[in-house]
From Swiss-Prot:
Main location: cytoplasm
HAMAP family assigned: RecF
Keyword Nucleotide-binding (UniProt): yes
Biological function: The RecF protein is involved in DNA metabolism; it is required for DNA replication and normal SOS inducibility. RecF binds preferentially to single-stranded, linear DNA. It also seems to bind ATP.
Protein's UniProt name: DNA replication and repair protein RecF
Taxonomic placement: Bacteria, Bacillati, Bacillota, Clostridia, Eubacteriales
InterPro entries: DNA-binding_RecF, DNA-binding_RecF_CS, P-loop_NTPase, RecF/RecN/SMC_N, RecF_2
Family membership: Belongs to the RecF family.
Domain of life: Bacteria
Entry-linked PROSITE patterns: RECF_1, RECF_2
Organism (species): Symbiobacterium thermophilum (strain DSM 24528 / JCM 14929 / IAM 14863 / T)
Amino acid sequence: MYLSTLQLGAFRNYDSLTIHFSPGLNVLYGDNAQGKTNLLEAIHFLATGRSHRTSRDPDMVQEGREELLARAAVVRRTGTIELELRCGLQTRKQLKINGIAERKIARLVGSLAVVLFSPDDLQLLKGPPSGRRRFLDLELSQISQTYLHHLMAYNRLVAQRNTLLKQPVIDEGLMAVYDEQLVETGAQLVVRRAEAVRRLSPIASRYHRMLAEDREDLELAYQSQGVGDDGAADLETVRRRLERELARLRSEERRRQVTLVGPHRDDVGFWVAGRDARLYASQGQQRTAVLALKLAELEFMSEEIGEPPLLLLDDVASELDPHRRHYLLSAVREGVQSFITCTDLEDLMVREWPADHRLFRVRAGTVVLDDRGLS
């Protein structure tokens, strides 16, 4: 798949903009605070319905304007898809797919798939478990609408159950219904996440060995109340484990008035050279592990959806040493549409540009195709 055209109106610092991209490599370069990251944010917004930088959609609306527009033409193996999102300061998001209004924004997810690697991702290992869960959820939601449906239902259920736990008198009948739904829906999420981590681990390990020049191994493991030490994660086993945990922690949940059982408590373990990278990894080891994970994500999603997602690299060249930088760019293989932002083309250390590349100079909300990038 690739993004052939991006159109923006009143999006961040872009008043009105239309860009035609290469199906291969697209480099967005220019000084800081000119709008490079805003372009990647717009692509991410069209892929997921959300910004990767803010939880408030109105933050993306240009100052002094009431509503933003983001529109894209996405070329898939099955044909071209036209996506359109509008969002206002006082109005909810509105979605059209191929000109037809959709009631649910979730219908957008999967039409355009992306893998984003930004400097913030370098905190994935040392940050809280919520970031690692979010990584899995975004990946799997783009692959499967069924997973996204289960995730949304589960999040609503946990919120409702937490509200019930805060009541002075708990409706036991309603709690029993919530418990049953939590076990069923939660087990679906645990099984799919555990399977994804099981498949990601050897792929990430392969990339990690190359990046670390065979000095260290990387291993991933999904850590869940629903998965035992033996790693068993079939649906029935996970259900039974969640049921047991609910019974064991029932009094503690009521004392603390919060749901303590379920996939919203899970984590992903990273081990580098046999040591827990979340606790002991150096900054260099963190960078290598996260880079290996992102390359594994790209490969895994390509296998799952039958074509590569877009790769968005936001100013990561400045965060990587020359060896990792060179490996990352060489790993951007043919057939993957890539978007790279940087302040200076020299930062990329590219000796020879591929034939299907385009260079765009970004300056104060304008984007100009560089003559060196005509292809």
